[in-house]
């Protein structure tokens, strides 16, 4: 096994946590945006729509880069089989726990909120399966994608490690221009694959499991591998943590293009393919923007930050049904969109933190929502004096 850096990457821990927690304002603003969701306010807000689009345009790309970084770090720490087992347990167990405890009750609630409970028995077997796939995976999709990526990277990481043993990694040089060209080509390649599927057999694109396991994995895998490469090559990591005006300007222009595509694109035309190209390069440039910002402001140890780093996954898991409950039963009684948005944040975050504190005191729930076995400290075993 290769040695791993002893110094903790505090800024990456913090960025990953805040990207996770950013899902809360993202989903609450979705209620008040012009995008159609499970629940929506009576009138959409232009500014909350813009805020929602901004978060959606880059958040998960950067998240998967950090996930790839830490995954390769653990890959060097553990034997291959143990690495796969540890990684799959840490994302798979919380996902499987959240389905019966969170997304199933959420699905049942939405059936009645949207008036679809009566029509459920009339659906075909496939429609029931596909509906359950979309609704039960729901916001847990990234955990499923991480399980798939981890399995694929059993082979990919081995190939990377073997290639490194036969080459001098100190001579590897990266530039943002080269990376931009590569990710532009990856975006075009993904768009070609999607368009080909759309032409050959369009119904498969509406299949929930195909979307999560194949299409989402295919799109985010380059970012996951990029994170692993950032761990391997210090020069690449420095490239991301060094502020770049070019990346900031390019990201801003790409976001404008993203908005224009959202506004004028058509789902029956090339809107989704265009979006994949834009968000592929936008995600790359935002890695530099977010990493450099986080490296400058978040690279320190703090008890408060550590608390939210540890709590971020649980809070994210429970926030989604809380958000939908708020949107279905409380939003209609608040006339102001901005007031509703702020009340939603207080409602969801407040209850999520309370639930987090409760679950910490129940060892079984603590294990199920983290995938980590509860380890008793030696002090706990010592008899009281």
Swiss-Prot record:
A GO biological-process term: glucan biosynthetic process
Major localization listed first in the record, in broad terms: membrane
Any GO MF annotation of the entry: transferase activity, transferring one-carbon groups
Keywords tagged on the record: Acyltransferase, Cell membrane, Membrane, Transferase, Transmembrane, Transmembrane helix
Cross-referenced Pfam families: Acyl_transf_3
Domain of life, per lineage: Bacteria
InterPro entries: Acyl_transf_3_dom, Glucan_succinyl_AcylTrfase, Glucans_biosynth_C
Membrane topology: Multi-pass membrane protein
UniProt key word Transmembrane helix: yes
Transmembrane segments: 17-37, 60-80, 91-111, 137-157, 173-193, 212-232, 239-259, 274-294, 311-331, 338-358
Pathway this chain belongs to: Glycan metabolism; osmoregulated periplasmic glucan (OPG) biosynthesis
Known function: Necessary for the succinyl substitution of periplasmic glucans. Could catalyze the transfer of succinyl residues from the cytoplasmic side of the membrane to the nascent glucan backbones on the periplasmic side of the membrane.
HAMAP family given in the database record: MdoC_OpgC
Record-given protein name: Glucans biosynthesis protein C
